[in-house]
């Protein structure tokens, strides 16, 4: 086993490529988390978007149409979740799991109804997301390996991180969203429509979740496979906890998952048992969640001790 072949320059892009679907999923979860809503349904929204993107791309011959309709499908799924949770007071985790199970069932059913197959659907007629070729990077081998031939959605995820960070921390809307999540009673007293903000957060997350699925099926691959999200939605939620729902820190957490996945794939080529490789992302998930929970507990203890000191004065 040659370490220089495993830890080569191409590993950087492989890490980012593996992390991109998880970053989209994590951003989907981060938006609702800012409103104090745990979006367990990210997995289902993403899976629905993945199937819709492939179906529409195949029928229309347009990858852009596939993405737009996938985002619309994610919007509808998120709308169902928002209505059930906000209007009918259903428990958010139960609704999220229901969305996940429904998405798994409906995509499997529609795969059989529309394409007459099960398991996997792949066809040259599926229009994949284009890759961006930057000619001048060919003169710089290292940068060429890392940055050339990214898909449009891989570039866009970086833009999306910047946009969401700006919205959260530099706009009135973001301030209101965080107020609703942290101090809902105070926000309501200040005249903020708490339910309206929660609806907005969930619906926007649905758009991003649909985009996450579209990238997975049209950018990361060019096919649809039953349950192809493979728990990436849950990994995104874990990364969101790791980053405290901050878009940049959350994305860094996603890169940890991407690195584990990329390293695992390379180790398998050197005879490492496939069971170990398949186990790696889930071990990383447990570690990330454990670290984030411990750091959260430490932070809360510090806050309590600070408050106790102030009271003693």
Each model region followed by its residue ranges:
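Short loop segments and helix-boundary regions at transmembrane helix junctions
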Residues: 34-38, 79-136, 230-248
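Loop-to-transmembrane alpha-helix initiation sites
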Residues: 93, 120-124, 149-156, 198, ...
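Helix-loop-helix "hairpin" substructures at the membrane interface of multi-pass membrane proteins
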Residues: 145-224, 247-248, 252
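Hydrophobic core segments of alpha-helical transmembrane domains in multi-pass membrane transport
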Residues: 25-26, 50, 54, 104-108, ...
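Cytosolic-side transmembrane-helix boundaries in multi-pass membrane proteins
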Residues: 182-189, 193-196, 267-313
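Transmembrane alpha-helical segments in multi-pass inner-membrane proteins
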Residues: 206-209, 219-282
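Transmembrane helix-bundle core of multi-pass membrane transporters
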Residues: 104-169, 272-277, 304-313
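Single transmembrane alpha-helix segments in multi-pass membrane proteins
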Residues: 10-59, 63, 67, 71, ...
